[in-house]
Amino acid sequence: MSDLFAKLMDQIEMPLDMRRSSAFSSADIIEVKVHSVSRLWEFHFAFAAVLPIATYRELHDRLIRTFEAADIKVTFDIQAAQVDYSDDLLQAYYQEAFEHAPCNSASFKSSFSKLKVTYEDDKLIIAAPGFVNNDHFRNNHLPNLVKQLEAFGFGILTIDMVSDQEMTEHLTKNFVSSRQALVKKAVQDNLEAQKSLEAMMPPVEEATPAPKFDYKERAAKRQAGFEKATITPMIEIETEENRIVFEGMVFDVERKTTRTGRHIINFKMTDYTSSFALQKWAKDDEELRKFDMIAKGAWLRVQGNIETNPFTKSLTMNVQQVKEIVRHERKDLMPEGQKRVELHAHTNMSTMDALPTVESLIDTAAKWGHKAIAITDHANVQSFPHGYHRARKAGIKAIFGLEANIVEDKVPISYEPVDMDLHEATYVVFDVETTGLSAMNNDLIQIAASKMFKGNIVEQFDEFIDPGHPLSAFTTELTGITDKHLQGAKPLVTVLKAFQDFCKDSILVAHNASFDVGFMNANYERHDLPKITQPVIDTLEFARNLYPEYKRHGLGPLTKRFQVSLDHHHMANYDAEATGRLLFIFLKDAREKHGIKNLLQLNTDLVAEDSYKKARIKHATIYVQNQVGLKNMFKLVSLSNIKYFEGVPRIPRTVLDAHREGLLLGTACSDGEVFDAVLTKGIDAAVDLARYYDFIEIMPPAIYQPLVVRELIKDQAGIEQVIRDLIEVGKRAKKPVLATGNVHYLEPEEEIYREIIVRSLGQGAMINRTIGRGEGAQPAPLPKAHFRTTNEMLDEFAFLGKDLAYQVVVQNTQDFADRIEEVEVVKGDLYTPYIDKAEETVAELTYQKAFEIYGNPLPDIIDLRIEKELTSILGNGFAVIYLASQMLVNRSNERGYLVGSRGSVGSSFVATMIGITEVNPMPPHYVCPSCQHSEFITDGSVGSGYDLPNKPCPKCGTPYQKDGQDIPFETFLGFDGDKVPDIDLNFSGDDQPSAHLDVRDIFGDEYAFRAGTVGTVAEKTAYGFVKGYERDYGKFYRDAEVDRLAAGAAGVKRTTGQHPGGIVVIPNYMDVYDFTPVQYPADDVTASWQTTHFNFHDIDENVLKLDILGHDDPTMIRKLQDLSGIDPITIPADDPGVMALFSGTEVLGVTPEQIGTPTGMLGIPEFGTNFVRGMVNETHPTTFAELLQLSGLSHGTDVWLGNAQDLIKEGIATLKTVIGCRDDIMVYLMHAGLEPKMAFTIMERVRKGLWLKISEEERNGYIDAMRENNVPDWYIESCGKIKYMFPKAHAAAYVLMALRVAYFKVHHPIMYYCAYFSIRAKAFELKTMSGGLDAVKARMEDITIKRKNNEATNVENDLFTTLEIVNEMLERGFKFGKLDLYKSDAIEFQIKGDTLIPPFIALEGLGENVAKQIVKARQEGEFLSKMELRKRGGASSTLVEKMDEMGILGNMPEDNQLSLFDDFF
């Protein structure tokens, strides 16, 4: 073994016995290839022989695991001097190959991994079934197997396959059998879902009869014609076939038009056995219209041929005939007034657990004629706002609730404690073994105990009990107890009496005592024996409170930690003795560390205040009864998320009690404490608990079915008995019993979507805990939790008898709904915070600035505009919104940053005057800065005041200032001026955190919250879930079915977050719970801000929301100001040099060929993208107004492409006259002669893409008015194509910032490039950037080629953008220097004459913290060696190596010779 190899083995801690084996005797490392960018290391090993398979796996796992800890990926291969081709070794390595990519592909692994291999005639022979012995596997997969075996050390093998006829027949038989079973199950599921409906539903004449799946006659009937053809389940189709007929629902449609004018409709259908891709061709528009019925959600019958699509390589139906059919939907058939109310329903806001939107849930209930429905999501109320609005629209009562996680505040260590010296007490430490977790449905099979005094065992008890039936395999596997152990055991009652005698005058002790004591008490009660009344100590809670730093407090982990013997865990005698040994360790530590000497002290002095964090969660349903209850609900949700969050939101019982007014409580599901008590403790215990609640919930037996699989309940009869017991509990406790459905999806066929979502959580989720052990272990099936009709629920509870079933299903649920009052979840008005004298301040600031600019008295046009705006702003209570925005902008300005405006706030002249925006919305005008004389151009002949020619004031000769963008106020606050203002502001990214804190400072911490968001499962993520489900559960879906399942699983809540800049301000005369609960984003309890629990859009018309966004433009401007000393406000908007950038490159001193683009737009905000540069090349803008047009055209949808672009190309219109920004429509139409109200309405219809969606009568009225005022037809047609338009004020703010940046590019280029690379560039490659023009152009060409082949990565695309600017900079005569260990800054680029010095952060892989550490370390002294740079500077070996390669370190010595591995370990 070489020294280098031995060193590696030390690092990965390879076991000594393996290292000393003959296999490792001559081991060596031939080569190590280190890929620094991808952090991949390739090892090439040499061994004397192929390793034993166990040794190989150990080497593989340790090598991977060790390097993963250093964030390094590892691969390795082996060269073996001698190769052993024995069958056993080959077979082992053959199977190992399928654990490595790419041999682990699903199709290859499932088909080949279990086949037998032999080595004959210098070949590896695979005995395979005939159907896999084909060219596909030979050509696509066997070469990968050859490579993998070579990597194992077998050299290059020749592999051949031979067909095994016996295996072929066997597998074919199994396949046919399983396929038939699958088809049978699919059909049966379909029939069951419609069974009750078909029995009771009156015939619908126009409806197509439900298909009768008689598959044996299918072949005979196939030719009978489209109308009478047998319907084929999609799951049956596996090969190309002709004249197949499907019936199903369309879930995806895409229409395309070919170059020849033919149309193709690609669509996907499902019949819920599987899904299929289909195609239908139409020769022209007229034929295409015949197939309008092919629409998403439609139910169709289609006939066609099944063929392999040459592009997708999947089976596709080429449709020949298609017909719309009527689907028999489930209906609630009970008469009016006799329909149930669902009181336990989850929406897609139940995190990763339920599917329906609250709208679809409410719509279904309303469609069925239900008078109310409850919403009870898990631990949140995020569906409340949408539910509130939808219920009001649907005319149905929404009952607002949630399914809460209830915990005890302090979980006691001791039950029934008395005044007793712990040191002098006698303890009976006991444990029971049972056949399951339910004391009512499972049996005791062993009771064992150790009586202990002062740490010594003084007596023992150990008795088996025969339950009267054979033990299940699971019980035997878990406990180690077999039927043999139980032979000859004493009767249960005898053992119980003996154990009671054994326990006298002792403190009982058990680990998780609530279970053991509960089981014992249930059995005592059953045999008329007294329950336990003596003190009990629970060592589980004892450990949790005594050792809170431990993550696990189970008996196994504790015995290991304290070195207590536990030879046979889960046999009662061994567990009891181990628990006793632990008890005395705990007592000693409690006495020495906490002074605990008396039994009473355990609960008073040791139980921690936060013991609720470890308490067992029990579910309860909580319902809002009135408006007081709604606020209390919001408080409970907030407290559970903010103060009591631990893994999930928790509500301690005392907290619930303190906020219970206006709330009603239900006992929830099988995870509720009453249900649990019925199972584990008996009816009496359940009755005591039930008195806490307002009603008892029972659910359909199907909901409880998983408990049978988990052996908590024996069978269906057991489930029905539990339900009867719950009814008895309600009777004794005098609480109504209500049947609820625990709805998680609407239709039975949607069960698979929930299955996929839930299983994606992995086995760490409680719901996915497996039953049994070993490879066959599977999680319990999920219950059938669809939304049931009244008749379906009555059928579920028919075993109770007709009258009782009706009472719990219908009468009691209706009575409960009647107890619920209507509440206002979302307020109808805007509630702004109060700022003293806000109205007076806004008016005063407005006039003060207006007088300063335009003089006093004001010009009429200014005076009237201010009066109009202030009337609206002050009259509607919007002054505080304006003033708050002004205060924030002013504070940022005082810190040295400009603030850019977004959206339409620049449409408000008042906003301009008080400093919220730089955009002046008045008509283009001149104004004298000396005497305030002004001239306004109001005829629409000038698009922007910045485009007016320069001229002096005619009164005093001072050069005029120019301004005005001609934007009507109506585009901000609506025609009537009463729309809630949405003021969005772009702060510097550097100053954004300070601006956020300003909000808190102005309004107070308790009134300012980040705007909350809800993150749901995206379709791409859902697609991954489906593929994972396929892999983990042995499923194989065709592509269309994967798409269907992914669409069905998408949209479920996954997490929460916060808007990047949104701050919600609660009025200071109310509190946040009047509007929304609060929480931390993504459940991060360390976050510095709390967020609204509701998505901020749900309440944005009720409270003030400030959009304080971070943006690069203000940061860039600040950087340029710092570098140049130039105040950006003084930069003219009509600088000729800047405008020259839009027409050529001459102003930059380069040719288009040098920089690869005909204009100077590279790196200019708004105009630097390829798309906008192309627009500039086509339109040649020369004025500010035309730049505004370009900004609007580039940001709109269907405004440029297929619209304005064609009009300009065809010479019909110009850049100046096409529709660019939304506001231009209103201004243009008013200048044309239309009434302002109509002009405004047309603008609103067009900008929202509604022009073609309004009624023909309304649209024709507008068109007639436009034509009467000589609006050209092309303009009217252009309006009809638009889907979305950009506000002109937004465009003006962005263009103004862009021109300021461009000014520096023209006049102060080195400063511009310094700022650009410091702030805007996203990717760097310093070796290329400092390598000169040839290196930069070569790398750009390399990326260009990759782009053409769709091979460029996202990083390379970002790098290309950076290199375009580097190339331009170099062509202009500037230089890009190398990283300098002693001159480079940590983060910012530095200017040295005509050269830019890059910062450390520009080196790939070097983060901000390390960059700052290097700068700090160099200030303390020179780096004398690479090792010192690593240690003091914090740079990794990879970074140091990269610096050395780039020549940054010069001749810096290593300091000492280190192995390749020491740098990482």
From Swiss-Prot:
GO biological process: DNA-templated DNA replication
Subcellular localization: Cytoplasm
A GO cellular component annotation in the UniProt record: cytoplasm
EC annotation from Swiss-Prot or TrEMBL: 2.7.7.7
Xref: InterPro entries: DNA_pol3_alpha_NTPase_dom, DNA_pol3_finger, DNA_PolC-like_N_II, DNA_PolC-type_N_I, DnaE2/DnaE/PolC, DNAPol_HHH, DnaQ, Exonuclease_RNaseT/DNA_pol3
Keyword Nucleotidyltransferase appears in the UniProt entry: yes
Primary localization: cytoplasm
Limits of the Exonuclease domain: 427-583
GO molecular function: 3'-5' exonuclease activity; DNA binding; DNA-directed DNA polymerase activity
Keywords of this entry: Cytoplasm, DNA replication, DNA-directed DNA polymerase, Exonuclease, Hydrolase, Nuclease, Nucleotidyltransferase, Transferase
Enzymatic reactions: DNA(n) + a 2'-deoxyribonucleoside 5'-triphosphate = DNA(n+1) + diphosphate
Domain of life: Bacteria
Keyword flag Cytoplasm: yes
A UniProt-annotated Pfam family: PHP
Entry's family note: Belongs to the DNA polymerase type-C family. PolC subfamily.
Biological role: Required for replicative DNA synthesis. This DNA polymerase also exhibits 3' to 5' exonuclease activity.
Protein name as catalogued: DNA polymerase III PolC-type
Gene this protein is translated from: polC
